[in-house]
């Protein structure tokens, strides 16, 4: 990433909070101090650490990201982020671009088809080459020209997707929009779980909905999310509960929020909440 672009971002980004930019689907996070592990749901997106370093915990796996790799999240994934080293002089800057599946499909329709490879383990850590980084650099610089964003942003984003699809890992992105691929089916399953948080999961029914055997569904679900379907649902429930508690503040009714996200037992909810976030839900109100 061009240092001039980094300096420009440092002048406009707020610290220690997420900023949604004028480019649709493009977000930034700038941290000027270390932070404990923060749990959140990463929407389907491409993420790049433009400056500094951060650790991402996905299930039991920990990956360290700098500006040499991007993070590819094909589905909504519960993550924890840990920034060990950040300061006012050397902030950590993270870019996130939501995946535009319609745009990816359009590009695939216009480019020569390639022989598909086996689905394999998806993986979230991809090497980041100069051509992709240069395209992101131009997308960021476009923020200085707001009148050009409507026309040029989509062209640059198309180039980014084209280069990602042409890269060694391109088939992993392609699978996300190809009907019948394992990735596409698991993406449908995660969407269903997210939109039915307060309902119990029947794995057999969910596997059937995706046209997969139960064993195959379990295998591919865990390859992509690093969690079992039940673990995935629990993480989403707890993160949604945390969001609701923050929204309602002092007026939050913990037992009602627990029921809203699918917990029948408030005590079980409190135990699992504290296990994930390190504090009880009631202490969030203080």
Model-derived regions: residue spans:
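Basic/polar phosphate-binding segments, predominantly the helix-turn-helix DNA-binding elements
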Residues: 159, 163-170, 176-178, 194-196, ...
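A short, N-terminal "cap"/entry segment at the start of jelly-roll beta-barrel domains
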Residues: 1-22, 35-36, 118-120, 142
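N-terminal regulatory/effector-sensing and dimerization cores
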Residues: 17-115
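Amphipathic alpha-helical segments enriched in hydrophobic/aromatic residues interleaved with Lys/Arg
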Residues: 104-159, 163, 189-191
